[in-house]
Amino acid sequence: MEHGEKNITIVDDKGNEQLCEVLFTFDSDQFNKSYVLYYPIEAQDDEEIEIHASSFVPNEAGEDGELMPIETEEEWDMIEETLNTFLADEDEEE
């Protein structure tokens, strides 16, 4: 996983692969981590999409990076606030 990627493939605990579109990535100085927000590409335009979030270590060697779960309630609060700001900015642009 690197900043700027448009699509990522998520593999669930059963080994199923799902292609997802990256909504955006960002860094948090507070938690000293990078985060990615993404959603399944197969979601229909008229459906409400479920946005997922993970932390990751930016990869400099061109290898596949590893997504990691969000660990604390404080991280979730920060991610939710960042997402709400992003969505509000998107609405203003339309």
Curated annotation (Swiss-Prot):
InterPro entries xref list: UPF0473 (IPR009711)
Family, as annotated: Belongs to the UPF0473 family.
Cited NCBIfam families: PRK13678.1-4, PRK13678.2-2, PRK13678.2-4
Entry protein name: UPF0473 protein BLi02866/BL02030
Organism: Bacillus licheniformis (strain ATCC 14580 / DSM 13 / JCM 2505 / CCUG 7422 / NBRC 12200 / NCIMB 9375 / NCTC 10341 / NRRL NRS-1264 / Gibson 46)
Higher taxonomy: Bacteria, Bacillati, Bacillota, Bacilli, Bacillales
